[in-house]
Design a protein with these regions (language model features):
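Beta-lactam-recognizing serine transpeptidase/beta-lactamase-like catalytic domain environment
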Residues: 1-226, 296
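Ligand-recognition elements built from short beta-strands and adjacent flexible loops
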Residues: 180, 194, 224-306
Length: 306
């Protein structure tokens, strides 16, 4: 998670030039900050390092190439994506930051759940049990774990990065923040795969936001997807979809009995972790997750030793 790439605002792959939103240059950043700032160019370079085969292996493992198996009729099987041998330079670059594919909202939910629940891809169900008129349990649906996609330690880091996105106060997920709750989230703004254009000539968009609560041990997942939102100001999901997710959480969490801890994390005091003897790259990740600005200063003794 401490992999670092440089974003100059534009990045060329074959004959295609990619940009971050507003052509913004994010500079040299790690994964936590790339997630928070939705840096397309970071993830293009990460995809190039991973390679087409490994990228597709994880795409498949997270369930994007198959039905979820939900207990509802007529689940679509018409997913669109590039297979490993179809992932050329441009296809891999586009896929690496979440475009060039068509997946269902339920597929996205099961994948996000796997990312934060310890790494397990689970079959979704409409209900968890069936009772009779007297309240006696007739059938327990149970949990069907299909496979483990990532390790529990990797899942823990993802939860921390998603909480950093919402609670840091500067990330795309800040508009999903609800006082007193530990919320993790990620925004997603993408062009629709059918490439249909609006009247103004721009491509139609999908604005989405995934939120989990509590961030350290998620019990609920909220996924908001807006199909080509008609908003004159913006189509960014951080502005349009994230507040909707926050509103849903503010209503659903009390109903489900998820208590607040009374802490306002938008202005919270952060305890600096003990990073003595920690490698600089690992220390950067931990500091970034907590939203702490930092700078490396070599001591006189270390300079002499070098």
């Amino acid at each position: 998670m401490n992999t670092i790439f440089t974003c100059a605002g534009a990045y060329g792959v074959a004959k295609q030039t990619y940009h971050c939103a507003g052509h913004k240059a994010h500079g040299t950043i790690n994964m936590a900050d790339a997630l928070r700032q939705s840096c397309n160019i970071y993830y293009i370079q990460l995809g190039q390092r991973v390679g087409s085969q490994q990228f597709h292996n994880y795409f498949d493992a997270f369930g994007f190439t198959e039905r979820t198996g939900v207990d509802l009729p007529s689940e679509t099987g018409l997913m669109k994506y590039y297979s490993a041998n179809q992932l050329g330079e441009v296809q891999l670059a586009s896929s690496a930051f979440g475009q060039a594919m068509a997946i269902t909202p339920l597929q996205m939910c099961t994948a996000v759940a796997a990312a934060v629940n310890g790494g397990y891809l689970v079959t979704p169900h409409v209900v968890d049990k069936i009772t009779d008129t007297n309240g006696n349990v007739v059938e327990e649906i149970g949990t069907n774990i299909r496979r483990q996609v990532i390790s529990e330690s990797t899942s823990d880091v993802i939860r921390q990065m998603m909480e950093y996105e919402v609670g840091n106060g500067t990330g795309g997920g800040k508009n999903a923040y609800v006082s007193g709750y530990r919320i993790g989230g990620k925004s997603g703004t993408s062009e629709q795969l059918n490439m249909h254009r609006r009247a103004d000539g721009d491509y139609k968009k999908v604005a989405s936001f995934a939120a989990v609560l509590p961030a350290d041990d998620p019990e609920i997942l909220v996924y908001v997807m807006l199909d080509d939102p008609n908003n004159a100001r913006t189509d960014y999901s951080s502005i349009l979809a994230a507040p909707v997710a926050g509103n849903i959480i503010s209503e659903v969490a009390p109903y489900l009995g998820i208590a607040t801890d009374g802490e306002d994390r938008s202005q919270t005091t952060v305890t600096v972790p003990n990073l003595i003897s920690t490698e600089w790259s690992n220390a950067q990740v931990q500091l970034n997750i907590q939203g702490l600005k930092h700078q490396l200063q070599e001591s006189q003794s270390s300079q002499s030793a070098a």
